[in-house]
UniProtKB/Swiss-Prot annotation:
A GO molecular function held by the record: rRNA (guanine-N7-)-methyltransferase activity
Protein's gene: rsmG
Gene3D superfamilies xref list: Vaccinia Virus protein VP39 (3.40.50.150)
EC numbers, comma separated: 2.1.1.170
Source species of the chain: Photobacterium profundum (strain SS9)
Family under the similarity heading: Belongs to the methyltransferase superfamily. RNA methyltransferase RsmG family.
Functional summary from the UniProt entry: Specifically methylates the N7 position of guanine in position 527 of 16S rRNA.
Residues noted as binding S-adenosyl-L-methionine in the record, renumbered to the chain: G73, L78, V124, E125, R139
GO cellular component: cytosol
Protein name per Swiss-Prot or TrEMBL: Ribosomal RNA small subunit methyltransferase G
InterPro entries per UniProt: rRNA_ssu_MeTfrase_G, SAM-dependent_MTases_sf
Localisation: Cytoplasm
Catalysed reaction equations from the record: guanosine(527) in 16S rRNA + S-adenosyl-L-methionine = N(7)-methylguanosine(527) in 16S rRNA + S-adenosyl-L-homocysteine
Length: 206
């Protein structure tokens, strides 16, 4: 599996260390193991996880500006855990309302010695951080409108929303609230993944 991940990463411009590769593979192994009992993801095959979960997450690492990030509706830690492994100098809060997911993330953080992740069990509307985040990340929301509406209280003054999407939809943009606008759309190239992926960056209007 390690060799397969190295081959996938070689098809991108990402730079990874041996330790990062070991941690990413370790995460997939733990996810595969826990998934049998806890049903954390619909993806069952570890090789498929490498593409749909690891590569789909880590390609975003090149676009993160700032130090403090929150992954809302992280599920089993996606994209938060792979991003934290790729960006050890940044801090990631991983938010989910389901206890089994947060227990899994705590186990991952402990076993793989990931120092820059804070798992939080909470509904997003009830979570009140002491300070805002530079980036609010999610691939969990059905629409960007849902994302910015539920997470409006989370960005810092100059913070952004980072929505991981499949197709980029002008219809979704039209449905955004007036206080929010799309500042950038970045097509993401993910080796061996069928279908298009986009990172949509949204900002509150001043």
């Amino acid at each position: 599996m390690k060799q397969r991940l190295v081959q996938l990463i070689a098809q991108t411009e990402l730079q990874v260390t041996e330790q990062q590769v070991q941690q990413l593979v370790g995460y997939v192994e733990l996810l595969h193991k826990w998934n049998k009992a806890y049903n954390l993801t619909s993806v069952r095959d570890p090789n498929e996880m490498l593409v749909k979960h690891i590569m789909d997450s880590i390609v975003v690492s090149a676009h993160l500006q700032g130090e403090n990030f929150i992954d809302v509706g992280t599920g089993p830690g996606l994209p938060g855990i792979p991003l934290a492994i790729m960006c050890p100098e940044k801090n990631f809060t991983l938010l989910d309302s389901l206890g089994k997911r947060i227990r899994f993330i705590k186990q991952v953080v402990h076993e793989l010695k990931i120092a820059n992740v804070t798992p939080v069990q909470s509904r997003v509307e009830e979570f009140q951080p002491e300070q805002g985040f530079d980036g609010v990340i999610s691939r969990a929301f059905a629409s960007m409108n849902d994302m910015v509406s539920w997470c409006h209280h989370l960005p810092a003054e100059n913070g952004h929303f980072l929505a991981l999407k499949g197709q980029f939809s002008e219809q979704e943009v039209a449905e955004l609230p007036e206080w929010c606008s799309v500042t950038e759309v970045k097509p993401l190239q993910i080796p061996e993944l069928e279908g298009k992926r986009h990172l949509v960056i949204l900002t509150a209007k001043k």
